[in-house]
Amino acid sequence: MTRETLLDRVIALLWKAEFTLSEKCDIRPRSFDVAARRGKTLLLVKVLSNIEGMSEETSQEMRRLSVLFNGSPIVIGEHTNDHPLEIGAVYLRYGIPCVNIETLHDFFIEEVPPLVYAAPGGLYVEIDGETLRSLREAKNISLGELAMALGVSRRTISKYESGMNATIEAALKLEEILDAPIACPVNMIVMFERTAKDADPSPNDLRNASALEKEALGTLMHIGFEVFHTTKAPFNALSQDDAAKMITGVSDYNEAMLKKAKFMSSLADVAGTYSLFIVKGPHRPKAVGNTLLIKSEELKQFDDRSDLFDLLLSREVKKANAGK
């Protein structure tokens, strides 16, 4: 199926799973296609037919944004370069969980988590070592006896009982011998959280910013915001202080800017943030949805960030309460 068809199916599935969704992003650049929230779970979702089409640069941006939004990234695909994605298996692409749409359905609608993850060499299962040891001892099976039945060394069985992962073939044989499940389910959300610290973004780094971005975002930094510049997202930065986050756009006033401001408003509704667009030159509307439009010259008149929040309130631009 085409990527667009797959994306539409993913969106329909997430609606069915009672997620609140942002608009579908058709703005370039885009490191994700849609944002989705259900309760405290916020997903940044990217859809690719071939998950190996995900570049390292885009993956890094998606991971950084997920940390900033307190969310989790996920890629939905159909295949790698070599083979289709297996149902019930989780693949990793630069630290981001990747699954097919059937696995997504099982996880969020049927509440059946995957049990298998892909790694170099094949498909693996995380063994519940304590359960394995308890079952073995309850059945009076020695390490040597279990090792012989499985065709591995005693040391390998000891490692399984200490939490070492096993191939899917070994895990299935262990469950057959012990007549009980020993595999731990794979939680795709927790899987990212375990490595999220590696994606911690650095604030106030404008080395790759354009001159217009440096001027506008530099003003936000001057009045007290931490600014996280983006290069692959459908907005220019995420700005924050101790109390709030703002999805931030920077542009001349034009039709493309209005389209981006509209998407940012829908994203803010889902992410539970403010949305601000700093515009160079004259503009007519004061807001697009919940995205405040402000002239760069007007922003320079502010003494501190409280002036900006006062303006947000006076123009009745709301911060979404998603997930609260």
UniProtKB/Swiss-Prot annotation:
Pfam families: HTH_3. Residues 143-162 bind DNA. Signal peptide: none annotated. The keyword Disulfide bond does not apply. Gene3D superfamilies: lambda repressor-like DNA-binding domains. Keywords: DNA-binding, Transcription, Transcription regulation. Residues 132-189 form the HTH cro/C1-type domain. One of its GO terms (molecular function) is DNA-binding transcription factor activity. This is Putative HTH-type transcriptional regulatory protein UNCMA_15260. It comes from Methanocella arvoryzae (strain DSM 22066 / NBRC 105507 / MRE50).
